[in-house]
C-alpha cells in the first residue's frame, strides 16, 4: 500500500471506508489503479469487496503520466474484466452518480458494483464528463492535456459569477475528441 501511495496505511483507509459504510454514505467509490507486478494479483480480492458491501470499486488502467508509468505495468481493461469474471459472471449494471467513463458491472446478488476505466486502451473521451481544477485555480478540460483555463481573474478581487460561468463553458468546449495516451 505504502509503495503505491507513499504515505498512510491501509488500516487508516479501511477505517474511513468502514465509517462511511456505517453512516450509509452513498455512493462510496474506491479507485484502484492497476499495475502489473504491483497490485494486479489483488483485482479479484478488491472486486469481491462489493459482494456484501454497497461499494463501487473502479479499476483504472495505469496512465502514461509521472515517474511510475511503464508500458510493461499496464494491465488492459479487458484483462481486468477477464480476471474479475473468474469470480463469477459479470452483468452490466447501472452506474452510480458521478462514475463518468467507467463501464460498470455487478455479480448477480452483489451489494455493490465494479467498474473498469480503460484510460489507455479504450477511447472514452466522448463519455468523459470530467474537468480538473488545479491548486493554482486552473481548470483543465482533459487530464491528458496541459491546456487549462485560468479561473483566478474571475475569482479575485471579487467573484464574477457570470465570467466564471463563461470560463467553465469555454473549458467544456475545449475538451478534446480523443486523448493521446495510447500513443505513449
What kind of region is each of these model predictions?
Residues 1-60:
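Radical SAM/AdoMet-radical enzyme domain recognition
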Residues 48-52, 62-184:
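Auxiliary Fe-S-binding modules of radical SAM enzymes
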Amino acid at each position: 500500500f505504502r509503495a503505491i501511495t507513499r504515505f498512510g496505511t491501509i488500516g487508516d483507509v479501511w477505517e474511513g471506508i468502514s465509517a462511511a459504510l456505517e453512516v450509509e454514505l452513498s455512493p462510496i467509490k474506491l479507485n484502484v489503479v492497476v499495475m502489473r507486478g504491483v497490485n494486479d494479483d489483488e483485482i479479484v480480492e478488491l472486486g469481491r469487496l462489493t459482494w456484501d458491501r454497497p461499494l463501487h470499486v473502479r479499476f483504472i488502467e495505469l496512465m502514461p503520466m509521472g515517474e511510475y508509468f511503464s508500458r510493461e505495468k499496464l494491465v488492459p481493461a479487458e484483462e481486468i474484466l477477464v480476471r474479475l469474471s473468474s469470480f463469477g459472471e459479470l452483468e452490466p449494471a447501472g452506474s452510480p452518480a458521478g462514475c463518468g467513463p467507467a463501464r460498470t458491472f455487478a455479480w448477480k446478488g452483489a451489494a455493490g458494483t465494479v467498474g473498469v476505466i480503460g484510460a489507455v486502451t479504450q477511447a472514452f473521451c466522448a463519455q468523459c464528463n470530467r474537468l480538473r481544477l488545479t491548486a493554482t485555480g486552473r481548470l483543465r478540460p482533459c487530464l491528458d492535456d496541459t491546456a487549462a483555463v485560468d479561473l483566478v481573474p474571475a475569482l479575485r478581487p471579487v467573484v464574477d459569477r457570470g465570467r466564471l460561468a463563461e470560463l467553465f463553458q469555454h473549458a467544456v468546449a475545449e475538451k478534446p475528441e480523443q486523448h493521446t495516451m495510447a500513443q505513449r
